[in-house]
Amino acid sequence: VEEFADKPGVIGFTVTSTRYKPVHANEYMRLYSMIEETGKPIAFHAGYHWQDPSLATCNSFLGMHALGFAWCNIVHMTNWVLNGIPERFPKLKSVWIESGLSWIPFVMQRLDDQYLMRMSEAPLLKQMPSDYMRQNCWYTCQPMEKSSEVGLKATFEMINAKTQLLYASDWPHFDFDAPRVIAEIPWIDEE
């Protein structure tokens, strides 16, 4: 951060899927503070590997690809919010990349539900987990899951897509999103 924050073209910092320490480990707090001071976001880029014990029982690329990218960010988001990172670093923007969008409403609802029963396990929170996810987090469209227009519309509403959705292509991967992926959604206006 110290070396690159002021370099031309640096617009933020990316963390690939962590496989060593969770995102709430104290070792990262200085890093989060430094990134927050730059005013630039931290981005979590989803990624999976076949050796992840929680995904090792998937026996096809289809299953692993469908679950793996979302699973990484589900775990990171859960730890990010419940451990009060948005409270500790209120000006730190987080971006959640390449895990699609459909997992977000599930995590919002599930965390809110569980939080209401166990608030003592998340003592740093001053609002509902979903509120942090709607206000302090941005999400990339890639891959845009368009198989259910009803589901996508509900997701857009829940994440406050008008302000929190970012375009990402993931070119040249096979499942990249061309710009039209957003432009062709019939209920989205030019704004």
How would you label these PLM feature ranges?
Residues 46, 52, 58-84, 88, ...:
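H/E-rich (His + Asp/Glu) clusters that bind or coordinate divalent metals
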Residues 1-76, 83:
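Active-site gating/metal-coordination segments in enzymes
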